[in-house]
């Protein structure tokens, strides 16, 4: 019996343990709100000092009753329409509070907790909200213009048409958030997480999204023109109708995406992981962004990524286009290096880069880097005419039964053409006479053999495609 009595006393002592002392700052705030008689709180430039104050739903609910400072419908502190700009809310707990249309511009609210709060049309412009928690908030049209939101959490928040232009969002977490129509123009959002978020029709133009994570997010008709998506993760993202014009997708993960309805004009792809990603070369325009900006070495890497992707989806013609552009970027880069070496009076560099430029330029003219049959036909025609002219100049082609050289254009062209396409000098009643003429015949025959082999290689490429 004594043991039971002792146990009951212990339980009673635990249940009657006093709550933490009520913060007098909180009491003063509640009294001030009640004195407004239903009107929004106006501080007239006098900021609140509520650092580490507990204004949470759980703390105030036992005291609320029908108090004027309590939002009975939402079960939280009622600060709707409050003018509390510049207030100190660092580490304050405002979970469940009603802050609809409240003005908190310039507030200091680092590590504050706004979870489950109503912040529709609230103004947090230029506020310091680093590490703050906005988990599950309802915040349509909330304004975070130029706010500091580093490492802030907006998980599962409803922030349709929210404004976050030029805000600092490094490390922020928007996983599962509804951000339909939100504006992030010019924001800095390195390492920000948007996993599974709804970002339809969002404005992310000129936003820094380096290392951002969009895995599984919906970006239908999103505007990402000029955004920096270096090393961003977009696996499983939905990008129907998105505008990626001029976007920097260098080293981004773009595996098995459907970009066929996206605008990709002058986008950058150097080092991007593209595999099974569906889009057409025409969507990029005449050149990738690196080439437009004169960054030929990076453009070469960009076209390589495109070439490999087009191969992976079986689009061989477009893979050939990307290959040719890649080779051309190599030539242009060699030209830039040649000019730099010339300016620096680097003879070795001049010879090395000059030779590379000339070799690439010749191969481009000859067969467009192994992709053009028409250019090979042109090379054949040019060489036939050139050698026919040389044969005429040397006067070394003598018709059989005649001691005089022929200068007939038909004789010269027919002999030159047959000599280009046969292994031995043609037997058409004309004999080459003289050392120079025989040397020309040999050189032309060897050149013809090389061109015929190249013709077979290019033809094989075309047949495979």
What do the PLM-derived regions correspond to, one by one?
Residues 220, 260, 265, 270, ...:
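Cytoplasmic (intracellular) domains, linkers, and terminal tails of multi-pass ion channels
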């Amino acid at each position: 019996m004594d043991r039971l009595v002792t146990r009951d006393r212990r339980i009673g002592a635990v249940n009657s343990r006093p709550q933490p002392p009520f913060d007098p700052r909180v009491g003063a705030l509640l009294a001030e709100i009640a004195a407004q008689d239903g009107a929004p709180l106006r501080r007239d430039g006098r900021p609140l000092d509520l650092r580490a104050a507990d204004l949470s739903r759980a703390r105030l609910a036992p005291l609320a009753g029908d108090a004027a400072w309590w939002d009975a419908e939402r079960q939280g502190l009622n600060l709707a329409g409050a003018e509390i700009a510049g207030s100190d809310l660092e580490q304050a707990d405002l979970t469940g509070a009603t802050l609809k249309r409240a003005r908190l511009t310039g507030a200091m609210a680092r590590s504050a907790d706004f979870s489950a709060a109503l912040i529709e049309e609230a103004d947090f412009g230029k506020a310091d909200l680093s590490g703050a928690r906005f988990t599950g908030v309802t915040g349509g049209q909330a304004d975070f213009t130029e706010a500091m939101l580093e490492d802030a959490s907006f998980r599962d928040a409803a922030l349709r048409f929210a404004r976050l232009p030029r805000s600092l969002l490094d490390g922020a977490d928007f996983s599962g958030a509804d951000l339909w129509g939100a504006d992030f123009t010019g924001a800095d959002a390195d390492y920000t997480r948007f996993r599974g978020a709804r970002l339809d029709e969002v404005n992310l133009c000129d936003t820094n999204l380096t290392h951002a994570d969009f895995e599984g997010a919906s970006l239908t008709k999103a505007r990402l023109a000029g955004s920096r998506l270096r090393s961003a993760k977009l696996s499983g993202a939905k990008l129907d109708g998105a505008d990626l014009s001029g976007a920097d997708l260098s080293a981004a993960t773009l595996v098995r995406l459907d970009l066929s309805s996206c605008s990709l004009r002058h986008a950058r792809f150097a080092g991007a992981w593209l595999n099974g990603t569906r889009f057409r070369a025409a969507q990029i325009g005449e050149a990738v962004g690196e080439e437009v900006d004169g960054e030929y070495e990076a453009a070469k890497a960009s076209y390589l990524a495109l070439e490999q992707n087009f191969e992976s989806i079986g689009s061989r013609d477009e893979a050939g286009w990307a290959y040719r552009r890649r080779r051309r970027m190599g030539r242009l880069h060699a030209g830039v290096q040649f000019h730099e070496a010339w300016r620096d009076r680097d003879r070795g560099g001049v010879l090395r880069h000059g030779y590379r430029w000339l070799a690439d330029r010749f191969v481009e003219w000859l067969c467009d880097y192994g992709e053009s049959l028409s250019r090979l036909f042109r090379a054949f025609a040019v060489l036939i005419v050139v050698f026919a002219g040389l044969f005429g100049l040397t006067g070394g082609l003598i018709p059989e039964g005649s001691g005089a050289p022929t200068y007939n254009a038909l004789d010269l062209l027919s002999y030159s053409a047959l000599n280009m396409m046969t292994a031995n000098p043609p037997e058409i009643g004309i004999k080459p006479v003289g050392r120079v003429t025989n040397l020309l015949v040999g050189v032309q025959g060897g050149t013809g053999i090389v061109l015929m082999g190249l013709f077979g290689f290019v033809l094989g490429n075309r047949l495979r495609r």
